[in-house]
Each structure stands twice: as structure tokens, then as C-alpha cells.
């Protein structure tokens, strides 16, 4: 249901620090759309739409 920072760092082959920035950015977009977000996690469907569409 959610990807964690560690999973995103592994998939994108980036540092954990960069993965946190990506997650924060995606969660900021979700908040603007009215969704409740969880720090350090991003919904799998939303992540896949943004990175693998």
C-alpha cells in the first residue's frame, strides 16, 4: 500500500537523504490535493504514476 524511504532509495538507486526529499515532495503534492499523508511513506500507486507512467 505504501513505499518507505528505504524502498524508494533502493528502487531509484539514490541516497536515503535524496529519497526523503522525494517523499516529502510527493507528500506535499498530495496534501495540496487534500489527502492526508504519512511522513516517510508514499502511496505505491501515486509513486508509480509519478515515476513509471
Task: Label each residue range with its predicted role.
Residues 1, 9-10:
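Amphipathic, hydrophobic secondary-structure cores in small proteins
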Residues 1-2, 53:
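Absolute protein N-terminus
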Residues 2-3, 41:
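A generic alpha-helix surface/boundary motif
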Residues 3-4, 25:
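Short Gly/charged-rich anion-binding patches and loops
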Residues 5-6, 45:
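Residues within the helices of the helix-turn-helix
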Residues 11-48, 52:
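Major-groove DNA-recognition helix of helix-turn-helix-type DNA-binding domains
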Amino acid at each position: 500500500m505504501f513505499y518507505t524511504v528505504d524502498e524508494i532509495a533502493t528502487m531509484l538507486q539514490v541516497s536515503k537523504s535524496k529519497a526523503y526529499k522525494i517523499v516529502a515532495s510527493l507528500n506535499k503534492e498530495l496534501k495540496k490535493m487534500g489527502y492526508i499523508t504519512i511522513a516517510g511513506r508514499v502511496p505505491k500507486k501515486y509513486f508509480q504514476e509519478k515515476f513509471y507512467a
